[in-house]
Curated annotation (Swiss-Prot):
Keywords in alphabetical order: FAD, Flavoprotein, Glycoprotein, Monooxygenase, Oxidoreductase, Signal
Protein name as catalogued: FAD-dependent monooxygenase nscC
Pathway named in the protein's UniProt entry: Secondary metabolite biosynthesis
InterPro entries in the cross-refs: FAD-bd, FAD/NAD-bd_sf
Gene3D superfamilies membership: FAD/NAD(P)-binding domain
Highest taxon above the source species: Eukaryota
Keyword presence, Signal: yes
Pfam assignment, any one: FAD_binding_3
Gene name of this polypeptide: nscC
Length: 408
C-alpha cells in the first residue's frame, strides 16, 4: 500500500511552522518549503498577546508560559521574560503620558518574542524533527483537494493531499488561486532601523525610562518613534526603532510615502527622512539615535504597510483547490496596531486541529470548518488594525487629553 500523500506547507514563518509542528505531533505527514536559506535574518521582536500564546501553549500540551518566555523573550539570556509595561511616552519631553491600569481586570498580559527565536522554539516543540526544505521558491500550484501538485523554481516537484499557504502578504499561492485578491496599501510611512549598543550604554540611556520593559513607546504629534529590544546579553543589546506616520494627504506630495520601492532602494536612507527627523525636536534618548548621523550606522528599511482581506466566497473557492490559507497570506495587518503574529499562531492551531479531525474522512469539510471558525476572527482583526493604526498616530493634543483621564 502506497504511503499517504503529505500535506505541503509553503512558508516556514510562524504560521507555517505552527501548523507543521502540530500536524507532526498528531502523526500527519507534512513537508515545509521555504524560499529563503536556513540563515535568513528576521530577528526583530513581536508582541504576543495572552489569547495568542495561550492558544499555542494549550495545543502543545498545556506548556507553561515560562517555557515559552525562556526560549523566545528578547531578554531571556539575562533571565528576563519579555515583559513590557505598556506605558506611552511623549518623545518631545521624555515624560510619561500614561500607563494602563495594572489592576484592571481587562488588561491583557503581553510578552515580547524574538521572531527568530520563536520560530526555532515552535519547531523544537516535539519529539519528531520537522521536515523543512529551504531554497524552494514556489513556481506554480495545480490540482485539487486530495491531489495537489506544486513545482518550485529549482525544478523540484511534489504531490500532496492539500497545500497550506503560509507564504505571507505577497503570497504566490494566493496570486495563482485567488488572483483577484490583491494587498491593499495603507497610506502610511514606516521606516524601521536596527542597531547595537553596549549593555552599559543601554543601562545608562534607556533603563531610567524603561526599567525592565522591553519597549520604550514614544509618541509625537501624529507620529510614533518606539524603541524595542530585539535581543539582550550581558554585554550588548540589539535594538530596533520605527518612525511612522500617516501619509500626507493623498500621498502624491509626500516624499517619504513610497509604497512601491524596489527592495534595494528600500534599504537606502532618503534625505527627506533625515530632514524630517531633524524637524521633530525629539528629547533624549530618541534624539541620540534618531538623527541623520546616527542612522547612517543602522540597518534601515522602508516598509510598505499592506493589508489583505478576503471574502467567505474566496475561501470556498480555495477549499475546492485544496488550499488552506494561514497567516499574512489571507489577513495581513499593519505592523503598528495589528495583531498579525497572534492570528498566525491561532491559524496554525485551528487548522492543524481541523485537519487532524478530518484527515481520515472528508478533508474538504475539515478545511471548511477551519475557515468558518477563523474567517470572522481574522477579517475583523484586519479592519480593527487599520483603525488602530490611525488611533496610535493621533495629534499630541489628543494624547495629552488621554493622559488626563489615565494619569501616571
Amino acid at each position: 500500500m502506497a504511503p499517504p500523500l503529505p500535506i505541503l506547507i509553503i512558508g516556514a514563518g510562524i504560521s507555517g511552522l505552527t501548523t507543521a509542528r502540530l500536524l507532526t505531533n498528531s502523526g500527519i505527514p507534512n513537508i515545509v518549503f521555504e524560499a529563503s536559506s536556513p540563515d535568513r535574518r528576521q530577528g526583530f521582536a513581536i508582541s504576543l498577546r495572552e489569547w495568542g500564546y495561550a492558544t499555542l501553549l494549550s495545543a502543545l500540551g498545556d506548556l507553561p508560559l515560562r517555557s515559552l518566555t525562556r526560549g523566545v523573550a528578547p531578554d531571556r539570556e539575562i533571565g528576563g521574560s519579555g515583559w513590557i509595561d505598556q506605558a506611552v511616552w511623549d518623545n518631545g519631553t521624555a515624560k510619561k503620558l500614561f500607563v494602563p491600569d495594572a489592576n484592571s481586570s481587562t488588561k491583557e498580559q503581553i510578552v515580547r518574542a524574538n521572531r527568530n527565536a520563536l520560530r526555532r522554539w515552535i519547531a523544537d516543540c516535539g519529539e519528531e524533527e520537522l521536515d523543512v526544505r529551504y531554497g524552494h521558491r514556489l513556481k506554480r500550484v495545480e490540482g485539487s483537494l486530495g491531489d495537489v501538485q506544486v513545482e518550485f523554481e529549482n525544478g523540484a516537484f511534489y504531490r500532496g493531499l492539500m497545500v497550506v499557504a503560509a507564504d505571507g502578504v505577497n503570497s504566490t499561492v494566493r496570486s495563482q488561486v485567488l488572483a483577484d485578491v490583491q494587498p491593499e496599501i495603507v497610506p502610511a510611512v514606516l521606516y524601521h532601523g536596527e542597531f547595537q549598543l553596549p549593555r552599559a550604554d543601554f543601562d545608562r540611556l534607556f533603563r531610567p525610562h524603561t526599567g525592565e520593559s522591553n519597549i520604550l513607546a514614544g509618541v509625537g504629534d501624529g507620529f510614533n518613534t518606539p524603541f524595542a529590544v530585539c535581543n539582550m546579553t550581558k554585554t550588548h543589546v540589539h535594538m530596533d526603532w520605527s518612525y511612522s506616520r500617516p501619509a500626507w494627504g493623498s500621498g502624491e506630495n509626500d516624499p517619504l510615502y513610497r509604497p512601491n520601492l524596489a527592495s534595494e532602494e528600500a534599504k537606502r536612507i532618503p534625505p527627506a527622512l533625515v530632514e524630517e527627523l531633524a524637524s521633530r525636536d525629539l528629547a533624549e534618548p530618541w534624539s541620540l539615535f534618531l538623527n541623520g548621523e546616527a542612522i547612517q550606522h543602522h540597518r534601515v528599511f522602508h516598509w510598505a504597510v499592506r493589508c489583505v482581506s478576503v471574502t467567505q466566497e474566496d475561501m470556498q473557492r480555495a477549499v475546492g483547490r485544496g488550499i488552506a490559507f494561514v497567516g499574512d497570506s489571507w489577513h495581513a495587518m499593519p505592523i503598528f496596531g495589528g495583531e498579525g503574529g497572534n492570528h498566525a499562531l491561532a491559524d496554525g492551531v485551528e487548522l492543524a486541529a481541523a485537519v487532524a479531525a478530518g484527515v481520515a474522512g472528508d478533508l474538504g469539510v475539515a478545511i471548511g470548518n477551519y475557515y468558518d471558525r477563523a474567517w470572522k476572527r481574522s477579517q475583523d482583526a484586519v479592519r480593527r488594525s487599520k483603525q488602530r493604526f490611525y488611533a496610535l498616530h493621533r495629534p499630541m493634543a489628543q494624547w495629552r487629553e488621554l493622559s488626563q483621564k489615565k494619569p501616571v
